[in-house]
Amino acid sequence: MIKIGNIELSSNIILAPMSGVTDLEFRRLVKRFGAGLVVSEMVASRAMIVESRQSLKKSAIMRDDATSACVQLAGCEPNVIAEAAKMNEGMGAKIIDLNFGCPAKKVVGGYSGSALMKDEQLAAKIFEATVEAVKLPVTVKMRMGWDDNTKNAPTLAKIAESSGVQMITVHGRTRCQFYSGNADWDFIRSVKESVKIPVIANGDITNFAKAKEALQKSGADGIMVGRGAYGKPWLISQIDHYLKTGEEKSAPSIAEQLDIVTEHYEAILDYYGESVGVPIARKHIGWYSSGLPNSAEFRGAVNLMNDPLAVKEKIAEFYTSVMETNKLKEF
């Protein structure tokens, strides 16, 4: 199993940090399905140190995951990131992850995220300041580089390792690719071969076969699942079972999915409150139902609803209708 500093993960499959997705309740759910590590949404370090309400929500720690709670920080000022890391350590985080991979224009425009890959000297200062500030393991998530002409992830990985960083995750695209094309898992092997600390492969890992291929091509110690987990918090459990046994584990039954969706929906309402929670839940409900019969009509109806009870009843009605449709197909 992967060791990050003195923390040993229960699985080599990790849930990626995703803005607007990996909030406390989604992380808790995916962790229950067997993820070795679940990473918070990206938290802006400067917002963190002024304790903005949004940043505190994003970095909230699962008290039932006290051994490996991981918070991802973004920013470009070494002292500010270090201070934010210390704050999160004080609030119970066990791992600090640094964001060197976000391709969003708003983020790179502030010289954060993947823009940091263009300045190796600044990157080194950020690594060193963060490692020195906390007693926790520090990790980093990066891309291959800024563009095809500057794929410097192996070099940056060496800098990170020499600065005391304990694990590196590489998304197999450049910043300029955003999410176009295919993730280059072969390139990640060059990062793995450049350092001795664990390296995690990320990008396009959406099913059993891709998980296995990503590990084989990259030689990585583990994989990080991102968008593939949209509406499928059980995917990590399926992949883990497949990699260990070679058997393709079925997704939960429709009845079981109804229970999962309902539980997640209620957890969102409890965490955010009904007025905020209902709009937040819509995207998750849409992802859960994608590919099921009449899902487009269902999503359209839910997106117009604001009453929490009405949404819950609609969820039950939809999944019940899917179960009935499936029964008819069996005859």
From Swiss-Prot:
Q: Which family does it belong to?
A: Belongs to the Dus family.
**Which species is the source of this protein?**
Rickettsia conorii (strain ATCC VR-613 / Malish 7)
Q: What is its EC number?
A: 1.3.1.-
The answer to whether the entry has keyword Aminoacyl-tRNA synthetase is: no
Catalytic activity reads: a 5,6-dihydrouridine in tRNA + NAD(+) = a uridine in tRNA + NADH + H(+); a 5,6-dihydrouridine in tRNA + NADP(+) = a uridine in tRNA + NADPH + H(+)
Write down the top EC class of this protein.
oxidoreductase
Instruction: Write out the catalytic residues in the record.
Output: 102
GO molecular function list: flavin adenine dinucleotide binding; tRNA binding; tRNA dihydrouridine synthase activity
What is the name of this protein? Probable tRNA-dihydrouridine synthase
Query: Which controlled-vocabulary keywords does the entry list?
Result: Flavoprotein, FMN, NADP, Oxidoreductase, RNA-binding, tRNA processing, tRNA-binding
Cofactor(s) annotated in UniProt = FMN
The record's listing under Pfam families reads: Dus
Q: Where is the signal peptide?
A: none
Question: Would the keyword tRNA processing be found if you checked this record's keyword annotation?
Answer: yes
Q: Where does FMN bind?
A: 17-19, 72, 141, 202-204, 226-227
Q: What does this protein do?
A: Catalyzes the synthesis of 5,6-dihydrouridine (D), a modified base found in the D-loop of most tRNAs, via the reduction of the C5-C6 double bond in target uridines.
